[in-house]
């Protein structure tokens, strides 16, 4: 099958390479702004753990006292254009991941907005909030019309960009050469017991630049309910790490799996109700929980739902290194902003 897809991947490579060349040569304009901008993204489609890494970075910035905004595209929403999130918004209006992040930080000095045009979105944020210190761009590595001050590239430990193929043969949005634009690379979803030798071998294989630090992160799961079996509902790109975690904890699950960002339908609701009747506990992710709200499930089922929260953590005691790098960048470059 991959041989059949090879011509299409070569065509895709030609298009993306031409586009990147136009930006590299200055024939297409990368916009700069009078405010620190940190871009978090990946070369592959889905499944790198982007949302918890954005949350980790935003948490650091807020703890440092910076007035921080997240700007996302709002994938899967029904609305268009710029929209600042509020407590009344639903996943249908702003997207599941932006709503998840907004709820995690909504009681702090924090702004969250969505806009498919990142240049327009940044300008609007600066106009509406001229005292902002920093904007974090969520999933914007290929959005080259914006030139951020820090580009953070994520790649999954078990599916790194150097061992993947371009769409449609593989999962890459652009070739592995695009990794050279990154200021920082984070290898995500690593085994928590990763050794320093394994780390060094991995870094050598990625062939990163001498001035391009590579960090390694793992997932920390919150406490689980004391049950031996449960239902599990997911609509995420790669549920395998979660399934492995539940199995390791001795929980047998009946898994109802949907595609990433899936918009639940009436027939899905019926299937979920039937599943819930067979189990005392229904497990789901934070991202799925905000979309499940739209189904208006009965109260007796809502009491069964247990939302699995996660956080990401850097290995090898390197949290302070990356955190201070980003804080120093924002502190050095932050000022009051204005847009013509």
Region locations from a protein language model:
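Short, flexible loop segments at boundaries between secondary-structure elements
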Residues: 259, 301-332
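Phosphate-bearing ligand-interacting subdomains
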Residues: 278-295
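C-terminal accessory "lid"/substrate-recognition subdomains
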Residues: 160-283, 335-340
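Conserved beta-strand elements of the Class I
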Residues: 69-71, 153, 229-233
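A transmembrane-helix-recognition feature enriched in membrane-embedded lipid enzymes
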Residues: 1-36, 329, 333, 337
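Walker A (P-loop) phosphate-binding motif
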Residues: 20-87, 192, 340
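Phosphate/Mg2+-binding loops and adjacent switch elements
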Residues: 74-212
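Residue-level signal for inorganic ion chemistry
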Residues: 11, 51, 101, 138, ...
């Amino acid at each position: 099958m991959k041989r059949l897809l090879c011509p299409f991947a070569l065509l895709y490579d030609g298009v993306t390479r031409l586009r990147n060349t136009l930006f590299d040569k200055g024939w297409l304009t990368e916009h700069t702004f009078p405010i620190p901008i940190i871009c978090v993204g990946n070369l592959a489609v889905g499944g790198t753990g982007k949302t918890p890494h954005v949350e980790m970075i935003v948490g650091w910035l807020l703890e440092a006292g910076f007035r921080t905004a997240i700007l996302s595209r709002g994938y899967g929403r029904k609305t268009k254009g710029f929209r600042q999130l509020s407590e009344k918004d639903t996943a249908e209006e702003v997207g599941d991941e932006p709503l998840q992040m907004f709820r995690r930080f909504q009681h702090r000095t924090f702004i969250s907005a969505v806009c498919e045009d990142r240049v327009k979105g940044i300008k609007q944020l600066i106009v509406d909030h001229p005292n902002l210190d920093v904007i974090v761009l969520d999933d914007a590595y290929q959005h080259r019309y914006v030139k951020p001050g820090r580009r953070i590239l994520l790649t999954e430990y078990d599916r790194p960009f150097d061992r993947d193929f371009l769409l449609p043969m593989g999962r890459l949005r652009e070739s592995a050469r695009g990794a050279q634009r990154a200021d920082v690379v984070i290898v995500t979803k690593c085994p928590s017991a990763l050794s320093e030798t394994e780390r060094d071998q991995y870094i050598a294989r990625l062939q990163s630049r001498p001035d391009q630090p590579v960090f390694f992160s793992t997932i920390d799961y919150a406490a689980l309910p004391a049950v031996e079996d449960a239902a599990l509902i997911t609509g995420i790109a790669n549920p395998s790490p979660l399934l492995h975690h539940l199995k390791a904890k001795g929980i047998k699950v009946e898994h109802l799996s949907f595609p990433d960002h899936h918009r639940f339908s009436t027939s899905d609701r019926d299937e979920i109700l039937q599943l819930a009747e067979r189990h005392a506990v229904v497990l789901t992710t934070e991202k799925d929980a905000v979309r499940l709200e739209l189904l208006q499930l009965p109260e007796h089922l809502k009491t069964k739902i247990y939302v699995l929260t996660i956080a990401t953590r850097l290995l090898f005691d390197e949290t302070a290194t990356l955190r201070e790098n980003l804080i120093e960048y924002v502190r050095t470059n932050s000022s009051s902003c204005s847009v013509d």
